[in-house]
C-alpha cells in the first residue's frame, strides 16, 4: 500500500535549505543566506516569557489567541488607526507561515487563482498549490525596483482570480512599494472585487526615511484586505512562532475554526511575551538601526565589485544583486561561491523565473562577517572576470 498522498509528494526541499545543507558539511562558512535576525530575542521579552511560566500560563488559550494579546495588537501596533475589533477581526497564529496556511485552507477552492509577485518568497506558491489554488506570477524587474506594475497585474486578472498577494518590504528584493503604486493596486482590487493579502512581516525594517503604508488604509480596502504579520523579524522572535492576522470577521471566524481543528492555538507563554513586547517599540527600532548600518556596509562593498549591479533596497534585510554579467546561472554562481570561498548566498531562481541572474544576499550576520564575506565575494568575482 502507498502511504503518502499525492499532494505530499509534490512538496520539495527549497533551494534555501539545500544551500544550508551543503554549507553545514563545511567549516569556516559565512552565511549571507538566512532570512532571520542573527541576534537573540531581547532580554525583556525573554523575561516576560519566564514570568508567564512562573505564573502558570502554560495551558491552551482560546483558539483565536488571548483577548489581551488581540487587544494589544488592535490598540498598540501599526493597525491602531484602522480600528480592528480584537474579538472578531484578529486571530493569533503559529507564526506568519501558520497564518498563511490557515488562510489558504479557508480561502481557496480548486482552480482559484492568486496573483503573486515574481520573484517572491518561495513558500507562497507551495502553500497555494497544496490548497488546490493556482499561483499566477506577476513579473517584475530591477529597472522598476522589483515593484509590481498595476497595468501588468490587470492583464493577468481572469474570472478565476480571487486574490492578489503583496509583500512590502519584500523578500527577496528588499524593495518597498510606493504609496502611488499601492493606491493604484487598491483601485484595481476594488474594480475587480479582489481580496488583497498583505504580508507585512518586514514593515518595521525601513531605511533612508522610507515609509510602508498599509493597503487596508486605502478607500474601500479594509473590507477586502487580509493583513498577515508576525513577531519573527521585528522582535527577533523567529523560533517563538507568534503571528497574527487582521481581516474581515468572516475570514477570521473560519480561520479560527480551522485552527481549532488543526493546531488549537499558538503557544501561551509566547503570546504573553509578545503582548509585553508591544509596549516596547524601541526594541524594533534597535533592530532596525542595526540592519540599516549593515545595509550600508553591504551596499558600499558591492558597489566596489565589478560585474555586480543592484538597486538600493529600502526595506527588509536583503539585497537582490544582478550577477548575470559573469555568464553563470544563479545556481552555478552560488554553488561556486560556496565551494571556492565558503560564502552562502541564495540563487535568485529559487524565487521565480524573474530571479534568474540574481542572488539574494541577507545582511543578517555580524559587521565583521559581512566585511569578510565582501572580501571573499570580491576575490571570487575578480577570478571570474579574468
Please state what every model-predicted region is:
Residues 64-65:
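Short beta-strand to alpha-helix junction loop
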Residues 69-70:
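Class I S-adenosyl-L-methionine
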Residues 2-6, 10-11, 20-26, 30, ...:
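PLP-dependent class I/II
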Residues 56-60:
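A short acidic, glycine-rich active-site loop
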Amino acid at each position: 500500500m502507498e502511504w503518502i498522498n499525492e499532494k505530499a509528494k509534490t512538496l520539495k526541499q527549497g533551494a534555501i535549505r539545500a544551500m544550508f545543507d551543503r554549507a553545514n558539511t563545511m567549516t569556516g562558512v559565512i552565511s549571507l543566506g538566512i532570512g532571520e535576525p542573527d541576534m537573540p530575542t531581547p532580554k525583556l521579552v525573554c523575561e516576560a516569557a519566564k514570568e508567564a511560566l512562573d505564573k502558570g500560563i502554560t495551558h491552551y488559550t482560546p483558539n483565536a489567541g488571548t483577548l489581551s494579546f488581540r487587544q494589544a495588537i488592535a490598540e498598540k501596533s501599526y493597525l491602531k488607526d484602522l480600528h480592528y475589533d480584537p474579538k472578531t477581526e484578529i486571530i493569533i497564529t503559529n507564526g506568519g507561515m501558520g497564518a498563511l496556511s490557515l488562510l489558504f485552507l479557508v480561502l481557496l477552492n480548486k482552480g482559484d487563482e492568486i496573483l503573486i509577485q515574481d520573484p517572491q518568497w518561495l513558500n507562497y506558491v507551495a502553500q497555494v498549490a497544496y490548497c488546490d489554488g493556482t499561483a499566477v506570477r506577476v513579473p517584475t524587474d530591477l529597472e522598476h525596483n522589483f515593484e509590481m506594475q498595476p497595468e501588468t497585474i490587470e492583464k493577468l486578472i481572469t474570472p478565476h482570480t480571487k486574490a492578489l498577494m503583496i509583500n512590502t518590504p519584500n523578500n527577496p528584493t528588499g524593495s518597498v512599494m510606493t504609496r502611488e503604486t499601492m493606491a493604484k493596486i487598491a483601485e484595481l482590487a476594488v474594480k475587480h472585487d479582489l481580496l488583497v493579502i498583505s504580508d507585512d512581516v518586514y514593515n518595521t525594517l525601513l531605511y533612508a526615511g522610507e515609509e510602508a503604508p498599509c493597503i487596508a488604509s486605502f478607500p474601500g480596502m479594509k473590507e477586502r484586505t487580509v493583513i498577515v504579520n508576525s513577531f519573527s523579524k521585528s522582535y527577533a522572535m523567529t523560533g517563538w512562532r507568534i503571528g497574527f492576522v487582521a481581516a474581515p470577521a468572516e475570514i477570521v471566524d473560519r480561520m479560527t475554526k480551522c485552527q481549532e481543528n488543526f493546531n488549537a492555538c499558538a503557544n501561551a507563554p509566547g503570546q504573553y511575551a509578545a503582548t509585553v513586547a508591544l509596549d516596547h517599540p524601541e526594541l524594533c527600532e534597535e533592530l532596525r538601526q542595526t540592519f540599516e548600518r549593515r545595509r550600508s556596509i553591504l551596499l558600499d562593498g558591492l558597489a566596489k565589485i565589478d560585474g555586480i549591479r543592484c538597486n538600493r533596497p529600502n526595506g527588509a534585510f536583503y539585497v537582490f544583486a544582478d550577477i548575470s554579467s559573469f555568464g553563470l546561472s544563479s545556481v552555478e554562481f552560488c554553488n561556486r561561491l560556496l565551494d571556492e570561498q565558503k560564502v552562502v548566498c541564495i540563487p535568485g531562481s529559487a524565487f521565480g523565473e524573474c530571479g534568474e541572474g540574481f542572488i539574494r544576499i541577507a545582511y543578517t550576520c555580524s559587521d565583521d562577517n559581512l566585511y569578510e564575506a565582501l572580501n571573499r565575494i570580491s576575490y571570487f568575482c575578480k577570478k571570474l572576470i579574468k
